[in-house]
Every structure is written in C-alpha cells, then in structure tokens.
Amino acid sequence: MKRIVFACMALLMGTATFAGGNGPKPKAETATIYIYRTGSWGAAANNWAMFVDEKKVCKLSNNRFIKVEVAPGKHRVSSKIGGIELLKKVTEIEIEAEAGKSYFVACNVKQSLTRARLEMTEVTKSSADKQMEKMTLDKCQEEAETK
C-alpha cells in the first residue's frame, strides 16, 4: 500500500513539474494576472484605465496586454474610461489568486447608443494564448520597465 501511495505522489509531482509549458513562470510567492484587450475598430481610440484592488495599473490599448504580479488572495480587477461619469458603468471581475499560478482576463468593448463599457471575462490559458498570440505589452508597462 505504501508503494502505491509513493508511486502516485511521485507521478503527481512529476507531471506538475512539466505542466506549465514554455511560457513565463510567475514567482512562487506571487500570482500573475494578465489583462488583455482584443482589437475593436470602433473603440480603438479609447484607452481604458485598468485598476487592480483600486490601484491604477495602466491604460489598456487595443491589441495589448498588461501583466500584474499580486499576492495570493482575492483581487478585484476593474476598468474606467476617462471623461464625465454620466451614464458610465464601472466594470469589474474578482480573481482568487494562488501563489505560483497565472490568471487571464479578456477585455472586450461593448457599446450602446449612450455608453461604452469594457466587459471582462476570466479565460483559460489556452484561450488566452490563442488571443494574445500577436499582442505586445502595453506601452505604459514598457515605459515603466525601461526606467
């Protein structure tokens, strides 16, 4: 019985080691949240201010992504567009982050006659990989990394 338990544990540890793929690995004590915005011609001029736990991270542009390292626990990702607050809806999503894991938030612009909002959805890594394939890091994070 001990041999079976030991064999199962060894197998699980071995598969966990190789499950991550070739992408960037988050630090073991933090989690990584990738927030990306797919292209939308009608809303291409709008840059949405992205917040994590009410702290402004970046203004997210079309076909770009941002990367945020967070401590384990609950985190609220929200967005706002600039200008007058009349008829504007703040959108948000909550992520329960675990250390060493990556999370992906897809952002899509939804427009009506009176307002535009950024709809956020948590997606799997495989879905995000397909959508983020040709995206680059948003300029606001590029500038922060070069300073």
Which residues make up each language-model segment?
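Short loop/turn and low-complexity linker motifs enriched in small/turn-promoting residues
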Residues: 20-147
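N-terminal signal peptide c-region/cleavage motif recognized by signal peptidases
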Residues: 14-16
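Sec-dependent N-terminal signal peptides
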Residues: 6-9
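Positively charged n-region of N-terminal signal peptides that target proteins for export
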Residues: 1-4
